[in-house]
Amino acid sequence: MVEKKTIKLDDVAELAGVSKTTVSRVLNNRGYLSDKTIKKVHDAMDKLNYRPNVIARQLFKQKTNLVALVFPTVDNPFFAELEAELEKRFDQLGYRVLMGNSQNNPAKEQDYLKLLLNHQVDGLIVGSHNQGISEYQKKTRPIVSIERFVGKQIPVVSSDNYQGGLLAVQRLLNDGCKHIIHTNYPINLVSPNELRQQAYEDLMNRHHRKPITYSVSFDVSDEEKERVFRKMFREHPEVDGIFADNDTNASLIIRVGKEFNRHVPDDLKVVGYDGANITRTLSPELTTIQQPIPEMATKAVELLLQLIDGKTDVKSVTLPVKMINSTTA
């Protein structure tokens, strides 16, 4: 039995009538080459049925086809769906994905970043509140952030949080609400969520209403959040509309409201934020502002790949939101 010959780079070069270096440059897209030369090399590869060694090419290009995702938690439906969408898109492009959930703990997040960077990832997509972490300032790898500001030179993919805030509050005003409260993260966190609160305050002031915001920490238990919401109902029994910072908190508010004999939509109207698929499935009655999670994932991957390819003029992107009308407002 005749052993099948292994086709090498030299064979492609000989058939194409070019040097081995030229074939290597075509494979790795390095340096200027004429279209005629590139076609000759590809024609030779096709004729010889030559398949490049992918691992060797990655080493030559100093790429691992490995990316990392760092988010606060997958317990939140928004981040759970976002991570799933990102992983799906990277898988389609031949990238492996490492994931770390920081629980919004700066020390844990820094440990994750060091670990992931030691794995020689090509780039990272993050969704962190922790702006002061040194790895973000050093920026030794391409980084794209989603819905969070982590560094001046790091592009952010976000939804139009200001417009989302306006839509939510205007809906409550249109429903006849006179006393509208907003729940949000603590104001010391640098996040596009601040734009939702700004929109709430601007619209309330425009209508000569007093804006009231209750801060709810991101990383506390549901029981602790419910304690905050009970305090809110006790301190403001007149509340008739609530713009919640996310759908999970909106659902908790509705549950706590029942303890105070406040039922949606008759005694209380609630608008959430995020509109993740799992929330729409489990709580279809929730009126909410839907973020375009699949589109945000697509854009984040696109920007990261541009950075990995060496582009330096990658800009932040803001995507539109929409109102999902249901029965809680």
Task: Please name every model-derived segment.
Residues 230-329:
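Flexible loop/turn connectors
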Residues 48-115, 119-120, 198-201:
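Amphipathic helical "hinge" segments at domain boundaries
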Residues 40, 78-92, 164-167, 191-210, ...:
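Short, solvent-exposed amphipathic alpha-helices that sit
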Residues 113, 121-127, 181-184, 236-246, ...:
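Periplasmic-binding protein-like
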Residues 127-167, 187, 248, 274-286:
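Flexible loop/hinge segments that line or gate small-molecule binding clefts
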Residues 166-211, 313-328:
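An alpha-beta-alpha
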Residues 157-182, 222-230, 250, 291-309:
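Hydrophobic alpha-helical segments within soluble ligand-binding/sensing domains
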Residues 1-64:
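N-terminal helix-turn-helix DNA-binding module of bacterial transcription factors
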